[in-house]
């Protein structure tokens, strides 16, 4: 009661200031609840809270939706969540020979890379592990750059993303620390750099999965488009490291992709390439020497 009379006896201006301060604090609290509530929070927020069978792409979505702008710079934007596209450049189909990395006379595809000195020793080991995932069972070899004109520049920029296929000259792969430094995420981005799109982008995907359009966040519907890509005469790969998870870009925690054959089929991978992922690499690059 004493505090009430003290407040009552303060000047009118003091009471106004006090009320404004209280109102501001409440506004901040309500704003935070609005921005980060399951219903209105960042894309897939509720889905990630309720489902623990995550994929590499789920981690990429988490990193990019929370921290990375879809506009990387004035002329480059992100498509399908993590594919960097420059204005005026075709982005989707990369099975023309012009966007593949060159194959050596010894039958291997040597992809040169430069690693940012900003990464710690442990982070460097994780990145190399992600590259080794791709090397095992394929003819692709990642080598530190010496004099090569075409190479991948690995940088801790904002978010996890890569260009599609070889662009010629220096091209960036962004692996933000620590969010993108997971082995599966790293392998996923390098697969884009080798020329591979997301598995559910295949033109024949409707034979294998159902896209639940009403469950997808409205401004991410384009991430589920189909494209005329070369499927390399290989079966649809539910377990590809390039496949979206079942709850990718869910606005309400409900599935956005459902397998047609069985709802028990797991979509995507968390950390390793599937057997078919490796077959894709070997067929696309016409590998004859498949070292283990």
Residue ranges, per PLM feature:
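Polybasic, low-complexity terminal segments and linkers that are predominantly intrinsically disordered
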Residues: 2-7
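Zinc-dependent metalloendopeptidases
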Residues: 8-292
